[in-house]
């Protein structure tokens, strides 16, 4: 018994020490930058490096993030989210969802929770797919920051998404393409955590996406990204038809 208690105390001490070191030596304050034309031009250069015009012409996408998979009808703002044992169709703009093959014993609150988490996963995981094309979204602020002698781009989202107020510092290569970014976001308590932007692939529509984001604590791979001009190029039948078949079955969340 004493041996087990000793192991427990050593484990707890190790966790506490690791947390202390993370906050003491890795937590960074949000850098200050200068807004203006130079920051906006750097943002446009970054967008051009991934062929943002091709992204605008991409009407449908599918990909995986961890154990979740997604289909996104970008033209109609609809999404299919598979997570855990759930399959959820989302009307993104109107915040309504439909649980495919739902358990009839689920309460309304449980259904709302399932749809809400599907939406949150879509917000996060679609952002990781291509945040570059969102640097001029309404509510964004772009600032030029000198980081280790290099000009970098700080983007703050003052509104929108599921976590407004988040900031990202883009570190670019000589062609303006992202090499990594540093995060100041509400879901990560340590400011300035850095993730790489590696393993770039070109989708069929011509847009470039990064599929590997290394960090010593948590590495994020994206799986099997596919981009098409239209959803009909991906599926013979419209997988979102059930969203519009019976409005009474839709769950607001």
Regions inferred by a protein language model and the residue ranges of each:
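Short, Lys/Arg-rich N-terminal segment immediately upstream of the first membrane anchor
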Residues: 1-5
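N-terminal leader/targeting segments and the immediate start of mature chains
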Residues: 6-66
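Short, basic/low-complexity N-terminal boundary segments at the transition from targeting/disordered tails
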Residues: 39-48, 52, 56-61, 119-127, ...
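Extended lipid/amphipathic-ligand handling interfaces
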Residues: 46, 71-74, 198-201
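Extracytoplasmic/periplasmic/luminal assembly and interaction segments
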Residues: 54-91
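Interface amphipathic segments
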Residues: 86-102
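Flexible, processing/modification-adjacent segments and terminal tails
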Residues: 98-166, 187-191, 249-253
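Gly/Pro-enriched, hydrophobic low-complexity segments
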Residues: 146-249
